[in-house]
């Protein structure tokens, strides 16, 4: 009997232990998941999509095979760099760099270049931990030799000891303080930037804070100009066209696990850096973030007449044969903050609800985003707080939700008034907001003076079966963010009708002297008989719009209006992926017909 009691007691204890272990494990799992989710988010904030050449991040944030079992299948190389050492990192190699204490370094990047290292001076470094070996995944080490006679196309990392030692004595705190009074400090934990002085940064000695000069993050570019005569390009790169990044930290920081699209040479001026490297063939096990935002690859893409608010068709082609117009937007963006803005807008409004416009003036781009909504009577739209730019996105979204009805872009309008609210984004300017009202020209209208305030609220009457595009010609009035209602200054009509009635339209706009060059220019783009055109008149410019161009006509427009040549070449190479789209363009001219700026439009 006593034995039976003992067995029962022991069994109960075992059951209790099992239950406790289950709940403890569940709690730890949930905690780990929450921690990993936060960590993933942190790395995502630093991650750069394929439109940047650097900083493509992994979701892995700890060198822990318990948290990330796939690390067991990778080959890891670990070593230290000290003052004067250099590390050649070929494109595509994953690297994770920790800085210990005060550390100053310079990174050089280049594309399609080579470095000069004598083959017989390379020694193989064995990895500290070994998983599944990749072909040719080796790291070599050599002492620096000033010999440029041997040329090798090297695809493996190389540690070059004592190859950049001449600057350590020069780059003292005093030297930097005299050169660089003000800096922008990157917080690697919160992914924020603080404007401060170099003296405060040095005195604070905060962990995870550092100074960088990466172009794609648009910070500290002044430092590169200040130090351009002090930073020495190593002799092994003396013939390579490269760019550089100055990197300064005063306490512990780590880069996170990432790779770059360019070959790089990390040169340590002062301090210690601990390095982990993984070969490109380990990428399947390293949990990389996607190279394209979700909104840039929406499938199937829709072919839509964006600014005429008419859905033409949903594409049914295989996904590998077509791309949406949002990819045309993505390829113009090289600013992380703007990518974040578009991500937020997409998360709020979803696909096929946001129209974008990209405007080019002397090579400088401005991005505009338009929201098509309906309202019974135009209402007051609150002004954004220009003194608090960090808060404008959520505030603008709230305004839209409170004041406007959301209308799906792929459905006909079934309300009386169409409002188009928009805001601009420029890296150097705060966005502004405007609202456009669309309404038709009365049949007997001969002069703008005949319009009165009541006419402005007689927007086109539509039904679920009737789309705005069947009500040509359309006349547009502007209701701006200062709530001043302006009379109409834009006409939309079929191209053939615009040319036929050009005298009447230009008389309405009071610019009959522009007839010759406007008539010739309208015929320059758009061979399709269903092409729609628009004339928009402002104080000192005339805007001409074409709706429904082919991709080849769109490329012609980009080439002739000084859009970025790299962008045009990319589109020309991949033009078949966009042949299903009907493109919309605009060119603004002065009254003599000289082009001033251009733009194109699409949908997210």
UniProtKB/Swiss-Prot annotation:
It is a single-pass membrane protein. GO terms for cellular component: membrane. Keywords: Membrane, Transmembrane, Transmembrane helix. Gene3D superfamilies: Cupin. Pfam families: Cupin_8. It is found in: Membrane. PROSITE patterns: JMJC. It comes from the Viruses. Residues 1-127 form the JmjC domain. Its main location: membrane. The chain crosses the membrane at residues 4-24. This is Putative JmjC domain-containing protein L887.
């Amino acid at each position: 009997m006593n034995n039976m009691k003992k067995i029962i007691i022991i069994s109960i204890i075992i059951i209790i232990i099992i239950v406790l272990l289950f709940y403890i494990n569940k709690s730890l799992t949930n905690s780990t998941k929450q921690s990993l989710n936060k960590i993933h988010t942190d790395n995502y904030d630093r991650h750069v999509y394929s439109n940047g050449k650097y900083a493509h991040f992994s979701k892995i944030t700890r060198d822990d095979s318990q948290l990330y079992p796939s690390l067991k299948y990778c080959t890891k190389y670990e070593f230290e760099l000290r003052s004067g050492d250099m590390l050649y990192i070929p494109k595509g190699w994953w690297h994770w760099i920790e800085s210990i204490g005060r550390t100053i370094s310079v990174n050089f990047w280049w594309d399609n270049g080579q470095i000069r290292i004598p083959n017989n001076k390379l020694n193989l470094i064995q990895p500290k931990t070994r998983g599944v070996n990749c072909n040719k995944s080796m790291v070599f080490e050599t002492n620096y030799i000033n010999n440029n006679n041997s040329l090798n196309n090297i695809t493996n990392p190389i540690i070059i000891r004592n190859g950049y030692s001449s600057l350590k004595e020069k780059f003292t705190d005093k030297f930097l303080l005299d050169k660089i009074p003000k800096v922008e400090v990157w917080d690697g934990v919160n992914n924020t930037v603080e404007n401060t002085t170099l003296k405060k940064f040095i005195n604070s000695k905060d962990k995870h804070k550092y100074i960088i000069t990466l172009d794609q993050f648009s910070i500290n570019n002044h430092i590169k100009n200040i130090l351009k005569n002090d930073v020495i390009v190593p002799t092994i790169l003396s013939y390579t066209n490269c760019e550089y990044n100055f990197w300064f930290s005063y306490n512990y920081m780590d880069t996170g696990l990432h790779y770059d699209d360019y070959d790089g040479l990390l040169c340590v001026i002062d301090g210690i850096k601990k390095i982990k490297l993984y070969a490109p063939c380990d990428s399947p096990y390293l949990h990389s973030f996607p190279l394209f935002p979700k909104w840039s690859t929406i499938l199937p893409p829709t072919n839509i007449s964006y600014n005429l608010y008419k859905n033409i068709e949903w594409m049914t082609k295989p996904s590998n044969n077509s791309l949406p117009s949002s990819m045309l937007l993505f390829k113009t963006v090289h600013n992380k903050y703007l990518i974040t803005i578009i991500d937020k807008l997409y998360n709020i409004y979803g696909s096929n609800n946001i129209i974008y416009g990209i405007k080019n003036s002397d090579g400088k781009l401005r991005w505009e985003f338009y929201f098509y909504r309906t309202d019974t009577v135009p209402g007051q739209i609150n002004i954004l707080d220009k003194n608090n730019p960090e808060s404008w996105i959520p505030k603008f979204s709230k305004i839209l939700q409170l004041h406007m009805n959301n209308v799906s872009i792929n459905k006909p309008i079934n309300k009386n008034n169409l409002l188009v609210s928009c805001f601009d984004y420029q890296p150097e300017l705060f966005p502004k907001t405007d609202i456009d009202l669309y309404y038709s020209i009365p049949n007997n209208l001969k002069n703008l003076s005949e319009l009165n305030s009541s006419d402005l609220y007689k927007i086109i009457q539509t039904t679920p079966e009737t789309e705005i595009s069947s009500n040509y010609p359309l006349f547009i009035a502007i209701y701006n963010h200062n709530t001043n209602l302006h009379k109409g200054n834009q006409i939309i009509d079929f191209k053939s009708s615009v040319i036929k009635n050009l005298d009447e339209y230009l008389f309405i706009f009071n610019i009959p002297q522009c007839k010759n060059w406007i008539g010739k220019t309208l015929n320059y783009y758009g061979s399709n008989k269903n092409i729609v055109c628009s004339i928009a008149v402002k104080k000192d410019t005339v805007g001409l719009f074409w709706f429904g161009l082919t991709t080849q006509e769109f490329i012609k427009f980009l080439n002739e209006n000084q859009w970025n040549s790299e962008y045009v070449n990319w589109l020309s190479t991949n033009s078949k992926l966009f042949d299903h789209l009907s493109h919309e363009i605009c060119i603004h001219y002065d009254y003599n017909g000289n082009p001033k700026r251009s733009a194109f439009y699409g949908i997210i």
